C-alpha cells in the first residue's frame, strides 16, 4: 500500500466559516487527490486571512457533487485551494468556466500544461529555456534495466508536492523491474542534476524574489522535506550574483507568460554545480499556502504579508469565456 493515494468522495462537505462579509467566497480545498492533506493545511491559513479581510467564507471539501454544491452556495468567487488532481490539473477551472464563477489561480489550459510534465517540457523547450534530459517510460514497455544512466529521477507524469518522486543514485540497491508504477501507467525518467535548489515566487506575472533550499537531511527536495520542519533551510534572498538573480526572475516571468498563468506561481530551478547552468524543473500553479510554504515566505521578503497576498490573489479572480 502506498502512502499517498487518491480516493473517490461522493459528497462535498460544506461548512460556513463566516456568515457576513463584503463578498461571498467559496474556499474549495481537500478533495480527492494524493495531496489532500497539504490542501487542507493551506486552506486553514487562507480561511483565516479571508475572514480578516471581511469576506463571507464558506469552506467546501470537494467531492464528486461539487457542481451541485456550488450552485446551492452561489458564491461570488471560488478560492481554488486544491492541490493535485481535480484542482491543479485544470478540472475545477474548467467546471467554473462553464458555471461562469470567477476563481483564483490559473485557468484550465494553463493549469493542465503546468501539471503535465511532458507538455510543460515542450513549452519550455520552445522558449529556449534549459530543462533536464528526459524520456517517458510506460509500464507496458517491460523495461528490466536502468532506462537512463544513473543518477536519474523517476517522476509521475501528473503529481505535485514531489509525491512519487524517487532519485536513483549509482550506489542504490534498485532494480527497475521491481518498480510498480503506483501513480499511473506512464512515468518520466529525468537526468538528475546536482546543484543549488532555487525557488522563484511570482504573483500576477511579476517575479517577487528568489529563495534557496538547503537540504539538511534527505537527499533531494521530497514530500517529507517540503512539509516538515527541520529538513531544509530556506535562504531568502538566495545568495547569488546579481546577474544570475536577475536571470532567474526574467526566466520565471517568461515561463509564466508563455503558459498564460494567473495569480500565484512557484517556479523551481537548479543551478548546476559544475557548469553554473540554470535548469528549470517545474512550475506550480497552485503553490502551497502552509506555514512552511515558499510563496508566502518570498512574498513577505518582498513586503507583502500573508493577508495582503491573499487579497491580491482574490483581486485577480476571473473565469474564461
UniProtKB/Swiss-Prot annotation:
<protein>
    <recommendedName>
        <fullName>D-alanine--D-alanine ligase</fullName>
        <ecNumber>6.3.2.4</ecNumber>
    </recommendedName>
</protein>
<dbReference type="GO" id="GO:0009252">
    <property type="term" value="P:peptidoglycan biosynthetic process"/>
</dbReference>
<dbReference type="InterPro" id="IPR011761">
    <property type="entry name" value="ATP-grasp"/>
</dbReference>
<dbReference type="InterPro" id="IPR016185">
    <property type="entry name" value="PreATP-grasp_dom_sf"/>
</dbReference>
<feature type="binding site">
    <location>
        <position position="282"/>
    </location>
    <ligand>
        <name>Mg(2+) 2</name>
    </ligand>
</feature>
<keyword id="KW-0961">Cell wall biogenesis/degradation</keyword>
<keyword id="KW-0464">Manganese</keyword>
<comment type="function">
    <text>Cell wall formation.</text>
</comment>
<comment type="pathway">
    <text>Cell wall biogenesis; peptidoglycan biosynthesis.</text>
</comment>
<keyword id="KW-0573">Peptidoglycan synthesis</keyword>
<keyword id="KW-0436">Ligase</keyword>
<keyword id="KW-0963">Cytoplasm</keyword>
<keyword id="KW-0547">Nucleotide-binding</keyword>
<keyword id="KW-0479">Metal-binding</keyword>
<dbReference type="InterPro" id="IPR011095">
    <property type="entry name" value="Dala_Dala_lig_C"/>
</dbReference>
<keyword id="KW-0460">Magnesium</keyword>
<feature type="binding site">
    <location>
        <position position="282"/>
    </location>
    <ligand>
        <name>Mg(2+) 1</name>
    </ligand>
</feature>
<keyword id="KW-0067">ATP-binding</keyword>
<dbReference type="InterPro" id="IPR005905">
    <property type="entry name" value="D_ala_D_ala"/>
</dbReference>
<feature type="binding site">
    <location>
        <position position="284"/>
    </location>
    <ligand>
        <name>Mg(2+) 2</name>
    </ligand>
</feature>
<dbReference type="GO" id="GO:0046872">
    <property type="term" value="F:metal ion binding"/>
</dbReference>
<dbReference type="Pfam" id="PF01820">
    <property type="entry name" value="Dala_Dala_lig_N"/>
</dbReference>
<feature type="domain" description="ATP-grasp">
    <location>
        <begin position="121"/>
        <end position="315"/>
    </location>
</feature>
<dbReference type="InterPro" id="IPR011127">
    <property type="entry name" value="Dala_Dala_lig_N"/>
</dbReference>
<dbReference type="GO" id="GO:0005524">
    <property type="term" value="F:ATP binding"/>
</dbReference>
<comment type="similarity">
    <text>Belongs to the D-alanine--D-alanine ligase family.</text>
</comment>
<dbReference type="GO" id="GO:0005737">
    <property type="term" value="C:cytoplasm"/>
</dbReference>
<dbReference type="GO" id="GO:0008716">
    <property type="term" value="F:D-alanine-D-alanine ligase activity"/>
</dbReference>
<dbReference type="InterPro" id="IPR013815">
    <property type="entry name" value="ATP_grasp_subdomain_1"/>
</dbReference>
<dbReference type="InterPro" id="IPR000291">
    <property type="entry name" value="D-Ala_lig_Van_CS"/>
</dbReference>
<feature type="binding site">
    <location>
        <position position="268"/>
    </location>
    <ligand>
        <name>Mg(2+) 1</name>
    </ligand>
</feature>
<feature type="binding site">
    <location>
        <begin position="148"/>
        <end position="199"/>
    </location>
    <ligand>
        <name>ATP</name>
    </ligand>
</feature>
<dbReference type="Pfam" id="PF07478">
    <property type="entry name" value="Dala_Dala_lig_C"/>
</dbReference>
<dbReference type="GO" id="GO:0008360">
    <property type="term" value="P:regulation of cell shape"/>
</dbReference>
<dbReference type="GO" id="GO:0071555">
    <property type="term" value="P:cell wall organization"/>
</dbReference>
<keyword id="KW-0133">Cell shape</keyword>
